[in-house]
Amino acid sequence: MQTPTFYDIFKQLNNTPRPSHHEERVADFLCNFAQQYGLRYRRDAQNCVVIEKDATPGHENAEPVVILNHMDMVCVAKDGYLRDGHAFDPLSDEIRAYIETVKNPDGSESRWMKAEGTSLGADNGMGLSMALAILADDSLVHGPLEVLTTTNEEDGMSGAEALSTDFIKGRKVINLDSEAYDEITMGAAGAYLQIAHFKADWANVPDGYVFRRIVIDGGLGGHSGVDINKGRCHTNQEICRFIQNFGTDKMMVCAINGGTANASISSVAEVIVAVRPETEKALTEAVVAYNDQLRRQFATTDAGISMRGEETNACSQYLRNAGDIVCAFNELPIGMLKMRDDMPGTVMTSNNAGRIITTDSEVTISCHSRSFSNEEMRALGQGITATFKKYGAVNVELLMDTPAWVERADSPLVALTCQTFQDVLGFEPKKVAMHFVLEAAYYVQKYPGVEIASIGPLIIEPHSTSERVNLDTADNIWKVTLELLKRLA
């Protein structure tokens, strides 16, 4: 049987639908792969799979090494994209990859893999394919191996969170899920996600009022970990500031909504208000003035930001407690709150209020806090809870309390990985810690003494239909990984 390349395996993976929360088929694929090559494997209730491979003869006494990846992907398609005449179905349709050669500014060429009409799944399919290719190749030199593949990494990390403390034996973990080719990730912030619930205290809007929809949009938004220190407009924050500045004594708030995801910086927000006819002019002037202020304030970060008011359908009721809800929001610490002293350019602690939603029964506000200090993160979260309750929240729901992966400055594995990059590729990668949650946090918590180094090929715009992976960097990460395994043996 011919040994498959990791590109061969990646193609097989992309023939197996694997969106988050639907990993049964790809878990079957992994178990069948293990059986095909006569390897031991285990599968838990979350469909996480670990495949074991014995050491190369003569290296049996080496410390076991874990190669870590996740099997799920963010599967999105372009608007209106059809697959063989029907709308793309992530639960049944394969990913169709192709390779494009691009001319670089210096005249050289780069090879990129993309997908036809959908996200590619190089995050984390490329790393997983490399791990499986290592399992399939008996010519390689390595110690005892455990290839661990988790589920639902992209939408909650429930697979990693539920792992039993005896699921793996190794304490040296090579993670192939990084997306910056010239970096080694050696730490990550923890996360604390809360949802505040305010009861919607409705009252009837008196006759004779006029209704306006006030919208802030055109914000750049972004990832609330990666982009939180870039000074971008948080539209939820600005709409609440506007409401408080104008005054709920002069207008009735019928609904307030903003943001699309808890972990994203809000790029659009709106409020529906009712005002007396004699107040309409003042409201219009206030919107124009606030729009001018936003455009000046965010001219360099959010060039498309704008605020406008427009007529809208009448509402029968307004929120009597809107003033309290807005005050609660405006007391929240939002954005980058502290930078790390020991790692220039890295955010230490932040908070993002990514969504505010009005329903028939309640108004909810989400707060996604992050920090490299678990104590600081939880203290921040507790302060936010107190603020919400001070203004009448009936419940503050804690949805995530994930510990930080605090890097080990003296990690022998990280040092060896850096040296291997230098020897194989001629450069030493930058050592970084990420201001967002990574699965590694759970391994640090569950497996005392674990060391983790995360590397990977260059992946641009993951989780989108523009996702692409640089194949030249993938080839080089493959070389580094093989040499690293040899040195660990």
Positions of predicted regions on the chain:
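Acidic/His- and Gly-rich active-site-bordering loop/insert found
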Residues: 2-112
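Midchain, well-structured core segments that form catalytic/ion-binding scaffolds
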Residues: 17, 96, 103, 108-118, ...
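Zn-dependent metallopeptidase/amidohydrolase metal-coordination segment
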Residues: 341, 348-350, 354-364, 368, ...
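Substrate-recognition/cap regions that form aromatic- and gly/pro-loop-enriched pockets
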Residues: 348-436
